[in-house]
Amino acid sequence: MSEYTNVAEIFGEDVFNDAVMQQRLPKKVYKDLKQTILEGKELSLEMADVIAHEMKEWAIEKGATHYTHWFQPLTGVTAEKHDSFITAPLPNGKVLMSFSGKELIKGEPDASSFPSGGLRATFEARGYTAWDCTSPAFVREDDGGAILCIPTAFCSYTGEALDQKTPLLRSMEAVQEQALRLIRLFGNTTSRKVKPSVGVEQEY
């Protein structure tokens, strides 16, 4: 008889989900991050530094040595730019492992390597990845080791979407804005967020 695996126990074990954040983050930081996720509140760099540190420590505990801003360019497949947590050797022969809030929030891959649909000229090819905190980070393991994957949006330096996720996020924001306006007309004054979802129909 094969060994029994309790799916409920292992489900999400490699995801930096709400349960992990609540356990590892200081209460104030956790509260501010939840407000950012639910209401779009701006997150300070100081708070981002704390989140990045705890995310790094959690990932290292799971064997990760690198992190990547994980995004969906217009190629039809995902893309990653890998960076190491190792920043400098120490005099005692050890190494320093660090990950800052700035590195968590923003990355700068070579946008000229990805299609843009003619949105910009080659000399304007600069692009940025921006952390999407509404999607949880996760650790992915393969033959090369474990890596912390941080879901991000990918935009040009002038704000044009260069990926498949940014238009989706902007559409969800627009739907939420109008849905909240509508439910206010029906007397609902307490709801702060509308979460659109779409799924395949049963007959599909």
List each language-model region with its residue ranges.
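Glycine-rich, acidic/polar active-site loops that bind/position phosphate-bearing ligands
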Residues: A125-E203
